[in-house]
């Protein structure tokens, strides 16, 4: 089962209307059940002129290769895509998935793959 299939399964089983955190936790359960290595809530420092000036928190990093960023909003937008690209730049990883579990009935999970 791949990341996209897992996300679809989560949304089918849980349905809409939960917080991003609930879907995040469900992804952790699914990854553990499948024996897939992941890190949750990795702190990613932001550097400027040799100084750490802040940080971002990556939702999940799978197999030290793929960033997963979860949302529970109406639809993915440019700001979310920029956030995903920032994660790739700051981590040096090549792939991120933006996964949105939109509220409301009759919706589908929205997945956008970003590559560096």
Region locations from a protein language model:
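Solvent-exposed, charged helical/coil patches
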Residues: 1-37, 95, 107-108, 112-116
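Conserved catalytic cores of phosphodiester-cleaving nucleases, focusing on short active-site segments
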Residues: 15, 58-76, 87
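Residues at secondary-structure transition points
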Residues: 18, 22, 51-55, 75-78, ...
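A short acidic/basic microdomain associated with nuclease active sites
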Residues: 34-50
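Acidic pyrophosphate-coordinating catalytic loop
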Residues: 48-51, 106-108
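Nucleic-acid nuclease catalytic cores
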Residues: 71-116
